[in-house]
């Protein structure tokens, strides 16, 4: 690479020994060898990249020539590989089309099933009479109809107010607050440490 002979290496070694001394010479040699390795690696990478670029250019030129000749004068091996590639591409396309058809068929079936289920639920809800839905306990109005019949002079707002005051309905949703309202004297307070 540098075209250095054995005698020139010995001369460089003696000069390095005199200048650097025996302690620093091995470290300097290791450093120089590391630089040489790095330079050789870079040169090899550049050579490989140039070779790949040349191959790529040759391939592109051969493709252009083949396009100009319309693939009629290609060698039998190249025409055979081109036909194989076309067949494999057609096979892959047909497989994809078949898979697409199956998927669309399955999704159409599932959509039809869901629509049938929705229609059946709508029919079931239509057959259930609204009066029976209103009679369930959750759907009962808050207004007490018995109390409204006893006092017909009360307005609906007053009837609703009385219904809110009814503890039997109120206790169904909330626990009684009596236990929390009064403080328990069971815990004696220590007032001696307050200053």
Swiss-Prot record:
Coiled coil: none
Keyword terms of this UniProt record: Cell inner membrane, Cell membrane, Membrane, Protein transport, Translocation, Transmembrane, Transmembrane helix, Transport
Biased segments, Polar residues type: 183-195
Main location: membrane
Protein's membrane topology: Single-pass membrane protein
Record field: transmembrane: 1-21
Keyword match Transmembrane helix: yes
Residues covered by region (Disordered): 166-195
S-S pairs: none
Subcellular location, record wording: Cell inner membrane
GO-annotated biological processes: protein transport by the Tat complex
GO cellular component: TAT protein transport complex
Gene3D superfamilies named in the record: 1.20.5.3310
Domain of life per record: Bacteria
Oligomeric form and interacting partners: The Tat system comprises two distinct complexes: a TatABC complex, containing multiple copies of TatA, TatB and TatC subunits, and a separate TatA complex, containing only TatA subunits. Substrates initially bind to the TatABC complex, which probably triggers association of the separate TatA complex to form the active translocon.
Role played: Part of the twin-arginine translocation (Tat) system that transports large folded proteins containing a characteristic twin-arginine motif in their signal peptide across membranes. Together with TatC, TatB is part of a receptor directly interacting with Tat signal peptides. TatB may form an oligomeric binding site that transiently accommodates folded Tat precursor proteins before their translocation.
Family: Belongs to the TatB family.
Protein name, UniProt field: Sec-independent protein translocase protein TatB
């Amino acid at each position: 690479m540098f075209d250095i002979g054995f005698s020139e290496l010995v001369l460089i070694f003696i000069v390095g020994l005199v200048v650097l001394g025996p302690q620093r010479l091995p470290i300097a040699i290791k450093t120089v060898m590391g630089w040489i390795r790095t330079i050789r690696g870079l040169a090899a990478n550049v050579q490989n990249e140039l070779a790949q670029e040349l191959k790529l250019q040759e391939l592109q030129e051969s493709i252009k020539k083949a396009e100009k000749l319309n693939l009629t004068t290609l060698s039998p091996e190249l025409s055979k590989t081109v036909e194989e590639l076309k067949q494999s591409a057609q096979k892959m396309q047909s497989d994809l089309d078949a898979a697409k058809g199956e998927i669309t068929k399955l999704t159409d079936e599932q959509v039809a099933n869901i629509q049938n289920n929705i229609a059946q639920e709508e029919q079931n809800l239509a057959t259930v009479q609204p009066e029976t839905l209103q009679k369930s306990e959750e759907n009962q109005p808050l207004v007490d109809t018995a109390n409204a019949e006893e006092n017909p002079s009360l307005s609906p707002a007053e009837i609703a107010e009385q219904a809110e005051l009814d503890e039997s309905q109120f206790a169904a949703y909330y626990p009684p607050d009596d236990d929390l309202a009064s403080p328990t004297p069971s815990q004696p307070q220590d007032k001696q440490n307050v200053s």
